[in-house]
Amino acid sequence: MALIVQKFGGSSVKDRDRIFNVARIVANTHNAGNDVVVVVSAQGDTTDDLIAKAGEITHNPSAREMDMLLATGEQISISLLAMALNELGCHAISLTGWQAGFRTDRAYTKARISRLETERISSELERNRVVVVAGFQGLNKLDDITTLGRGGSDTSAVAIAAALHADRCQIFTDVEGVYTADPRKVRNTRKLDEITFDEMLELASLGAQVLNNRSVELAKKYNVELEVLSSLNPVPGTVVKEVTKDMEGMLIKGVAKDTDVAVITILNVPDEPGMSFKIFGLLAQKNINVDIILQSTGRDGKKDISFTCAEGEAEVAMRVLKDSAHFSNVSVDTTCAKVSIVGAGMQSHSGVASKMFEALSNNNINIKMISTSEIKISCIIDRADADKAVSAIHDMLFD
């Protein structure tokens, strides 16, 4: 008997037919003699609808109250799925995140898991029940409901798999696995049989929406192999693991874009020690994640510093910097996007960057900023060119 954790996203449970489809997948897994824990997201566009409802009341809702509101979406999903499973003769019980034992820090709307108390889940499994858990949510030390941020249900599933030492952790989506690019927008994409944690982490953080990057971080930390599958088409998916069989096979595993990007530029920064610390220390105090950083050559004792962050955090970043006595000349560009290629094979092969830049040049796409690591190359470009850039780069590297 194996212990299997299965996670289903919002599109997989968006209506009655999809819920019963998921229930049959879960019931078949359980009837095969396995213990099953299911983690479910809110149905369809429920989270966006709840955010819109809050906007009808106030333009500045408190983070605590937003968590109280958003957590209701998953509670609807888990109860309906548990009902469907019981209707199929498969004994099931639904648990909220806090009933399942998720304890978090106090960072409302983007909380991090501090611990998972598994006694309740284990006790229900011992009673031969399928345990249906609300993803994305937990409880902090103040006994307040918290949410884990977008994609938090993936993180919930991996945390359960790690804590229970599950034999498998399956992430069901509306696509059949991890592809070299978004198959809905790019032609001739390839589905990957395997991908490493590091490669998947880069793709997830760069905008590939198959897996949440925090879930991949957690899977890598606890070596939880993930299997990305379609809830609509029962075909083999993609396995995410530490080491893949084709480590020296495909040079590039994927091309991704991220349109949630803002470029903030600070002009005339004193060219002296400690200024970068002051800038990024202020941003760190507000939990603003910075990605690419570009510093100009100093002149007349001054320099310019540009960096990228999520567009949703740009307003706070601008306010924090302008409120400082040191930085008054600050501007923001929200018309940018980031396109990236990822692959462990780049570590030992030359010429990959030139092909990427050639593809952009051939399509008259200007590069504003460049960032590289051992397995990633990213370029900041105009947002209007993002889709064209991904297709051009994919054609250059995979055709």
Predicted feature locations:
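Nucleotide/pyrophosphate-binding catalytic subdomain
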Residues: 1-216, 308, 381-382
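Short phosphate-binding/catalytic loops that engage adenosine nucleotides
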Residues: 34, 90, 224, 288, ...
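Short hydrophobic alpha-helical runs that function as membrane-insertion/retention elements
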Residues: 168-172, 226-228, 291
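Surface-exposed amphipathic alpha-helical tracts and adjacent flexible/coil segments at the periphery
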Residues: 211, 222, 233-238, 314
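Acidic-aromatic/histidine active-site loop/patch
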Residues: 219
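Active-site C-terminal subdomain of aminotransferase-like
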Residues: 224-235, 259
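A conserved regulatory-domain signal marking ACT and ACT-like small-molecule sensing domains
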Residues: 236-399
